[in-house]
Amino acid sequence: MVKAATRVRKKVKKNVAEGIAHVHASFNNTIVTITDRQGNALSWATSGGAGFKGSRKSTPFAAQVAAEQAGRAAQEYGVKNLEVRIKGPGPGRESAVRALNAAGFKITSISDVTPVPHNGCRPPKKRRI
């Protein structure tokens, strides 16, 4: 029995002029997600996915490489303007924003959206080295 050939539709890339770059900088990793205005993800990259493993993931350079990768993928959608939202205390905060700026995006605003507890969960104990 021969199957009828199914037509393969080419995925149409939507053209988005402005987006939002969400930078989640934890102490162990940095995640950069570029979304449209509604919050639908266009591209994302992590410092672990950029080839860094272990303690090198948490460096500013790894965050810079991850932001460059996410930026290159977002430029295929026609993103020109970015609003940057930074979350977390990690070391890759500033370098990710600098990398997006150097990638040719016009950054309209930078906001810190780090969640601050109203005395919620107990924080992790201090490290003794």
Curated annotation (Swiss-Prot):
The keyword Membrane does not apply. Belongs to the universal ribosomal protein uS11 family. One of its GO terms (biological process) is translation. Part of the 30S ribosomal subunit. Interacts with proteins S7 and S18. Binds to IF-3. This is Small ribosomal subunit protein uS11. GO terms for molecular function: rRNA binding; structural constituent of ribosome. It comes from the Bacteria. Located on the platform of the 30S subunit, it bridges several disparate RNA helices of the 16S rRNA. Forms part of the Shine-Dalgarno cleft in the 70S ribosome. InterPro entries: Ribosomal_uS11 (IPR001971), Ribosomal_uS11_bac-type (IPR019981), Ribosomal_uS11_CS (IPR018102), Ribosomal_uS11_sf (IPR036967). Keywords: Ribonucleoprotein, Ribosomal protein, RNA-binding, rRNA-binding. PROSITE patterns: RIBOSOMAL_S11. One of its GO terms (cellular component) is ribonucleoprotein complex. Pfam families: Ribosomal_S11.
